[in-house]
Amino acid sequence: MNLSRILLLSMFFLSAMGQLPSQDIMALLEFKKGIKHDPTGFVLNSWNDESIDFNGCPSSWNGIVCNGGNVAGVVLDNLGLTADADFSLFSNLTKLVKLSMSNNSLSGVLPNDLGSFKSLQFLDLSDNLFSSSLPKEIGRSVSLRNLSLSGNNFSGEIPESMGGLISLQSLDMSSNSLSGPLPKSLTRLNDLLYLNLSSNGFTGKMPRGFELISSLEVLDLHGNSIDGNLDGEFFLLTNASYVDISGNRLVTTSGKLLPGVSESIKHLNLSHNQLEGSLTSGFQLFQNLKVLDLSYNMLSGELPGFNYVYDLEVLKLSNNRFSGSLPNNLLKGDSLLLTTLDLSGNNLSGPVSSIMSTTLHTLDLSSNSLTGELPLLTGGCVLLDLSNNQFEGNLTRWSKWENIEYLDLSQNHFTGSFPDATPQLLRANHLNLSYNKLTGSLPERIPTHYPKLRVLDISSNSLEGPIPGALLSMPTLEEIHLQNNGMTGNIGPLPSSGSRIRLLDLSHNRFDGDLPGVFGSLTNLQVLNLAANNLSGSLPSSMNDIVSLSSLDVSQNHFTGPLPSNLSSNIMAFNVSYNDLSGTVPENLKNFPPPSFYPGNSKLVLPAGSPGSSASEASKNKSTNKLVKVVIIVSCAVALIILILVAILLFCICKSRRREERSITGKETNRRAQTIPSGSGGGMVVSAEDLVASRKGSSSEILSPDEKLAVATGFSPSKTSNLSWSPGSGDSFPADQQLARLDVRSPDRLVGELHFLDDSIKLTPEELSRAPAEVLGRSSHGTSYRATLDNGVFLTVKWLREGVAKQRKEFAKEVKKFSNIRHPNVVTLRGYYWGPTQHEKLILSDYISPGSLASFLYDRPGRKGPPLAWTQRLKIAVDVARGLNYLHFDRAVPHGNLKATNILLDGAELNARVADYCLHRLMTQAGTVEQILDAGILGYRAPELAASRKPLPSFKSDVYAFGVILLEILTGRCAGDVITGEQEGVDLTDWVRLRVAEGRGAECFDSVLTQEMGSDPVTEKGMKEVLGIALRCIRSVSERPGIKTIYEDLSSI
């Protein structure tokens, strides 16, 4: 009996012990404590010590997988968790096989004891916010089969110990900030099936030995800085089926690209490198491939015949230097399975025969030198781009084309009228015939012949006659481009409702009459351009109903009456000048600069106190009242004298208070109008910074309270305006002057998280708080400081304005991509700070001295040094083009904010480096729109960006901005200055175009350069060549060359 009692007690005791928290449970509960945010409650509502199984494993907890009494798996993917993760806790889970927490907002570092996870086979921490370097002990995790750390901010080199992961089958470390050479030890991972190290900053040569990994199926190294020669042995011997080494710096030394390609490779991408030579005439390079992408290289010669190539499905050879004719085999219907063919951006010539292939869906032959008439047949083509060639003839051949949905024939030499015969393009949704020589009128049956049309562009031809009656009422149309023709008649009729039209451009035609009163029915309209017509009457009040309108231009017409009282608050571009409008400008339009309203509109009045109202009055009455000019000039002179007297008074006061201090003069940017020569005549130049300041208001309206206090310490170049033209990054201040600090309230004010993109800087938030910080300037997205660290190192700190930055996770993922950007002509970003409040977002980058291009170029008070010589200016232009070429082709990102103040000159040699790049990727849509709007006011915005409600920077908009900068370099003038004189209020680009069109292009050059040009014919030739390049850069987007071409052309001068 006693023995039975003992047994029962023992069983009860063991049962009770089973309910005690195990080592596994304690580790999980400790991890739970680090979770700051769990939007779904998946973890916080489930993990508790009251729901534990009898065997001691919490299998009822969400995301937990048990094996017996032990935790075997923790799966917390895609939950939006925010946590400071301590992964060393999981070393206590001795039977853990799978740990997966991808796509959250987890931060922290990998533990040094990662190698003690003896049973771990699957580790996925991708798409989080982890940082720091990889621990050397990671190579001791010999049981790991799958390791994914992609989409984080890991930095430093991959440790050689990675070669110890002998069981590894899949390794993904893409989209991090890893750098250094690829370790040779990776080639010893004999079981590896998948290797992805793309979008990092790896340098050096690709190690030999990857071809010896017999199991390797996928090798992805794209988006790094790997250099050296293509390894022909790898391509011949590898067993991989997918190879992507695009976006690196690989070169070739022999005349042939490769001696051959392994039969196992099906997908090969070597685009965006520096490969030269020609393609082999044999078929061994292509016979087993399904996808081949060699675009954006420097390959040349004629294309091979592509005989006996049966498996190729995608062939991309765009933007190289191929010449000769187009191989007919590529367009046959019986020799290839080709679905996509892109040969654009080469030097191919000759005609294009009929396209017989029934499998070819996408054919891009744009930007070549192809001639002849259109092909008779297009086979199964759905997308056909033949733009920017030398095709001629009429358009009647397309009557037999059946499957086309996207057709671009722009920038050719087509003549005749728009076909009226019934075509087969019933599926067409995009039709671009711009920049040809088409004549006649548009047929009335367009809506029935093209029932699915969304985009119609027939701009820049010689069309006549009215708009077809039902065209504007087509239910599918979203964009209509009819500008730059000779069309006549009234505009209309318009649909009463249901219109999808987002863009309507009828500018530079001969339309007349009144606007339809039902204009407000175009409720989706975002861009409306009716400029340079003969329209009259009043602007219909129904325009107030177009709430999505972001760009409105009705200038150069004969409109009368008042402006609509309540136009859309989304309008970012506005121009009603050269009309006969009257009344008072509505309050919601008063912040647009005077050139939006004047010249013309002599009876139109800006509200009292509106920015620039005095300037507008001067402009409005200029042609009829010369007395006003005199008054303005005298007023400016008096104001200037007063400013000088005030400056002298302040100087005396400062000197009396602190004799040892030197007066800081010349620090305030001149905000007044300046009189400079305009060609052969004088003229007034209105600074674009004034327009930005007018639109923004005072600095207090855009700065956080902390920034206001920093500015108030005396380092703001202006306390009355939002500065968009800063004096440059090289401004210096007396050492004994009281410096502004980032910690304007207390030394420990920065209490958030400071992340660095590499290991070159070690700094805490508190140390950054203590750093003296001089204000360099302000822009639409924040304030820039020069911070002096304790070790004497300078950093540029950009304090982002409240509300412009994206959410933390997206911001962090984007900013870490910058760590891969390393180039002598690009300013290096070092890190970022994320504070606990909305206005505490900082970006840290290298400080560049002596200053910006603007501070050396413009003839303004405080200009640094003597005027730049031609050799210096040309070198700066080449440097900037080289930096942009790197961003576009090596990093595949547009700059997005290119202007003279963002080109910094480094050292005594004035090496140019572009700064403030890719900020649009860190900002909200509103922040991006505001940045682009400022670029428009300052003269750098590409015209196409005004045609989008949600504009985003692009490669082509960068080229436009670079063209404007070239004009600044040539003229010495600021892009945003409004130049008046012989012409009425034109900006820099229009002024240069006018001079060139009149055969007076040489009058545009800076007087300093003109003196050099007169004594050196080589200089004169170079300046004229750069002027030609600049004019190409500011063409319409479809005619604009890529930066690669521009860089090569500039380098050859």
Swiss-Prot record:
Q: Where is the Protein kinase domain?
A: 770-1053
Q: Does the keyword Zinc apply?
A: no
Instruction: Give the UniProt subcellular location, in the record's own words.
Output: Cell membrane
Q: Name one GO cellular component term.
A: plasma membrane
Annotated spans, Disordered = 662-684
Q: Which reaction does it catalyse?
A: L-seryl-[protein] + ATP = O-phospho-L-seryl-[protein] + ADP + H(+); L-threonyl-[protein] + ATP = O-phospho-L-threonyl-[protein] + ADP + H(+)
Could you tell me what this protein is called? LRR receptor-like serine/threonine-protein kinase GHR1
Origin organism is: Arabidopsis thaliana
